[in-house]
Amino acid sequence: MDSSLFSLKNSFGGFNDEELLRVQKIIEDLELTESIVSKEWVTFALQKKIAEDYSKHLDPFKVFLKKNIKKLKVQKTTEQIKEVAEEDPKMFENVEIEDIIFDTDSLVDESEIPKIKDEPSSSVDVSTARNKNNHNNNNNNNPSLPNKSMFKPTKQEMTNDNIKKVVIADDIGDFDFTTANQPIKQSNPTQLLNYKERKNIGGISYSMNNNEELKTDLSLREKKSCDLKGAGEEFYPIKYHRDTLEQRTKILKESVQSNNYTFPVSLDCQDDESIVRSVGRVWMYDQETILSKRFYLLGNERDSSSSGGSSGSASIFSLENNIPDYSMFSGQVVMAESKKIAGSHFYYTNKLYTPNPLPFFSQRKECGDINVMIASGPFDLQKSTPDYTPLDDLCNVVSNKKPHILFLMGPFIDESNVHIKKYSETFSELFNNLMKKLNDNIPSTTKVLIVPSLNDVDHEYIFPQPPYVPSVNLNSNILFVPNPFTLIINESFTIGITSSDIYNNLVSKAHFKNKHTPEDIFNMIINQNNYYPMHPAQAPISMRYLQHLNFPGFTPDILVVPKNSPIAAISNDVLCLGVPPIVGNKSTFGSYAELTVTKSKQSLAFDNNIPVSKRTIVNFKNI
């Protein structure tokens, strides 16, 4: 066999010699490279669902290439320049490769090259345009990198032709020419609210299960004491170490196999030998391709050397357009039911299965009604001196209502507070003073659980987070727990809580075929049996402690996460709560959650079969 055909046989698996000769002729006629044509064949084969009889599809494939010839020529030029640059890096030391490509007029029409319109400098406010990618693509998993831009321009207002513009008097840095001529939208400044002037104090902003039957039963029942027990293994004190990319990939792959996920169907499909079922973590094919169109399954045991995209032998999956519904995010463990394209590592997938949720806590005992309050930080008004008036008011509410349990989620000293550098107290002193305030103003009958946050400036920036360790003596009812945390109350029901921003992260990064609801977002978390199933994570996850993000062998009856606005939803019989901050952005003021977990109907005595989600009264009340 000719050496060139032997090379083609590796790129076009399943092709016979005659078909390979035709492919070679296409490459020569269109003056493209083998790598480009092989990649385009994969795309073409997936679109047309070609699994055999390649010969009859080669002429349409050549037409397909001709339609995209300009783009492919640019790709070829880019490959050639990069090869030269690798051999002699100094040749293009001060030149951008994209600039060289744009100079090749024979390959690209002038009409396709982005241009900057010649306009007077007064008509365009170029100083506000910056290259967003360079500021938004920080590695959030590295705590040593700043998560906020250090660019602090000064602003000066100018008027030109009665149009108010904003000019930033600073170096424009990496200027984004593609946005230079876009008009600037001048939004009205948000008026800061005065805390004392807030309205509807104590009013209900959101409720669930607030029906008369539960209220009547609640008034007849006697409150009992509350016994608390944490679930899961301790993982602190934390040991810091650096995770290499290879280590992170290996741990993520192994976690798929070690967790023993159960699915609605068997991994082996005996009814149809052409169908292949594969289990793994959804992983992006590249930054440009939509997740549903092409992805890897990290940890897929059917791959002999799966490496999450770094190896050409890793299987590539693509969802068919006729799938009625799906929801996907990177890091999600799924089972893909697919058909393989013969002679390749590509599969087109017509069904996706997610793991079955874990069962609920089983060893339940009879318990009286339990009252729980939940509040999320920040709790300060972000002034030049510490002002925790909202926390004082919350303590007064707790003192009057005397709930069994109070959850306080951080941040307690918020890193976004621009005034904290001006405070005379150290962060440790400020936190200890806050704990003393809770200790002195909250009844000893109320168990207070302090949950740290990644936005706490005085706590460890690693996830999962260990609990706070204050250097002050406190009553035994003030308890410090890790983030995330699962609590067993009176061996009757369970609450799982995390202050990580997993809800908003999933909303922004997940892919849905149809419109999604809050129940869909919560369902993603529950089906993954994990408090933070997204990878790559927007939280600084330590791979050494990855397993401590898993649910502790059961699904919590109540799942609590932070959210910008209050929400209560039932997903898979789990009561899911999104708790807003007490003090939000622009000094807006939020609400806290009040829960009453009741027994079943009095006539039925205690019935374990009625989910906690259906016998819990939920009220969000304004601070």
Swiss-Prot record:
Keywords: DNA replication, Nucleus, Phosphoprotein. One of its GO terms (biological process) is DNA replication initiation. GO terms for molecular function: DNA binding. The keyword rRNA-binding does not apply. Residues 113-151 are annotated as: Disordered. Disulfide bonds: none annotated. GO terms for cellular component: alpha DNA polymerase:primase complex. Residues 121-130 have a biased composition (Polar residues). InterPro entries: DNA_pol_a/d/e_bsu, DNA_pol_alpha_bsu. Its main location: nucleus. It is found in: Nucleus. May play an essential role at the early stage of chromosomal DNA replication by coupling the polymerase alpha/primase complex to the cellular replication machinery. DNA polymerase alpha:primase is a four subunit enzyme complex, which is assembled throughout the cell cycle, and consists of the two DNA polymerase subunits A and B, and the DNA primase large and small subunits. Subunit B binds to subunit A. PANTHER family: DNA POLYMERASE 2 ALPHA 70 KDA SUBUNIT (PTHR23061), DNA POLYMERASE ALPHA SUBUNIT B (PTHR23061:SF12). Belongs to the DNA polymerase alpha subunit B family. This is DNA polymerase alpha subunit B. It comes from Dictyostelium discoideum (Social amoeba). The lineage of its organism: Eukaryota, Amoebozoa, Evosea, Eumycetozoa, Dictyostelia. The gene is polA2.
